[in-house]
Curated annotation (Swiss-Prot):
SUPFAM superfamilies xref list: Undecaprenyl diphosphate synthase
Protein's name in the database: Isoprenyl transferase
Physiological role: Catalyzes the condensation of isopentenyl diphosphate (IPP) with allylic pyrophosphates generating different type of terpenoids.
Obligatory cofactor(s): Mg(2+)
Active site: D49, N97 (proton acceptor)
Gene3D superfamilies referenced in this protein's UniProt entry, alphabetically: Decaprenyl diphosphate synthase-like
InterPro entries found in the cross-reference section: UPP_synth-like, UPP_synth-like_CS, UPP_synth-like_sf
Amino acid sequence: MASLNSALRTAQHVRTATRGALLWGYEQKLAREVKANGKLPRHLGLILDGNRRFARAAGLQREMGHSFGADKAHEVLQWCLELGIPSATIWVLSTDNGSREPAELAHILSLLEREARQLAVDPRIHANRVRVRAIGQHDNFPPQVLAALNNLEESTAGYEGMRLNIAVGYGGREEIVDAVQSYLRTQAAQGATLEQAAENLTPDAIGAHLYAADQPDPDFIIRTSGEIRLSGFMLWQSVYSEYYFCDVYWPGFRRVDFLRALRDFQGRDRRFGK
């Protein structure tokens, strides 16, 4: 019996190793195809969904799901750098998430502070001259979180490499409201009346006051977890974005899933409403 169990374990190890080797080979093939095609998003949007469900499926505390999700964000940043994607926005925390249980929200904000401090000294950020910006409404964040985000932004402010936007306290409708308010304040500072401000209002005028106005609109947006909805992510900018919905939870998002999504994007014909 012992020898039979040993043989079964050996066979299982062989099957696992074989599957791993096949997946690795497939991943390398995908990477070559994506690189050879050369058509990559100028601005990639990532909706990081499924942290809590990942933890629940694995029998873990939900806080662990957020921790694994933070680790995955570091991996995906590396994949973007390897491919030379110019700009990426990752949606970490929505305005609606602010209504979650205090203990969970405190854990997420603590993670955000930790990750911001780590990114500020991450050799990859400085070697690749990645400019990092936190976008969203942060007025209600704890002072130590705000300090960490401000330090990260200041330490990369002069860089002209990849642009990385971390959307925290972010909502698409709130962004549009903020943009309109900013536009009106600018018009008032220039001495315009309300009637003149209304006459001057155009889509481009609002676009100039969005959080990432100096970057191209996202041309490709990936959402994990199998949920097929937009949830207000970059509402104004995503009018012509291509979407890809991936069935895996964010912490389980693999490089092969990332490459499959990009290959799908490369096969699409973007018509921009025409």
